[in-house]
């Protein structure tokens, strides 16, 4: 596919609504989760300029850490336009399930499990893209979160 053909497709694709389960995102201009970037003010700003969706910074899936100031800041959804999305990261099925429920109780309508971050410090904890090395673990994580 050439750049010119991508440009021709872009307006149609980007402006088409996207449905994720029971949530509708007005367009496909999605701001990816970025550590140190996609905090609450940044997400609200992006949405005010037309982004259909903006995902929180990665939040570690250990609810024991959620009382920390940094964790509370990352999971702050005050004033955000729905649908609200939180990204969580971890490798323990029970902790991931608890973190998912915590984010939902905190206002998130969509919870994204980080399976793409290549950062060394994330992968060393068998999280992010390192999860893709273990299909059985991914299945256990998804089963715990969905069920």
PLM region spans:
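Glycine-rich, positively charged N-terminal anion/phosphate-binding segment
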Residues: 12-19, 34-109
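Active-site-adjacent beta->alpha loops and helix N-cap segments on the catalytic face
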Residues: 64-71, 120-142
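Alpha-helix-loop-beta-strand connector modules within alpha/beta enzyme cores
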Residues: 75-83, 132-147
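A contiguous, low-structure linker/loop signature
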Residues: 101-121, 127
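Ala/Thr-enriched low-complexity intrinsically disordered regions
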Residues: 2-4, 10
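Extreme N-terminal starter segment of soluble prokaryotic enzymes
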Residues: 27-28
């Amino acid at each position: 596919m050439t750049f010119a053909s991508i440009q021709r497709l872009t307006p149609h694709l980007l402006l088409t609504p996207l449905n994720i389960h029971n949530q509708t995102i007005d367009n496909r201009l999605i701001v990816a989760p970025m550590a140190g970037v996609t905090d609450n003010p940044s997400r609200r700003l992006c949405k005010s300029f037309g982004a259909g969706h903006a995902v929180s910074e990665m939040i570690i899936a250990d609810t024991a850490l959620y009382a920390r100031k940094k964790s509370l800041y990352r999971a702050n959804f005050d004033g955000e336009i729905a649908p609200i999305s939180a990204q969580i990261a971890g490798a323990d099925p029970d902790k991931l399930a608890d973190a998912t429920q915590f984010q939902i109780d905190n206002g998130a309508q969509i919870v994204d499990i980080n399976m793409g971050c290549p950062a060394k410090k994330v992968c060393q904890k068998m999280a992010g893209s390192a999860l893709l090395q273990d299909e059985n673990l991914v299945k256990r994580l998804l089963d715990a979160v969905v069920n």
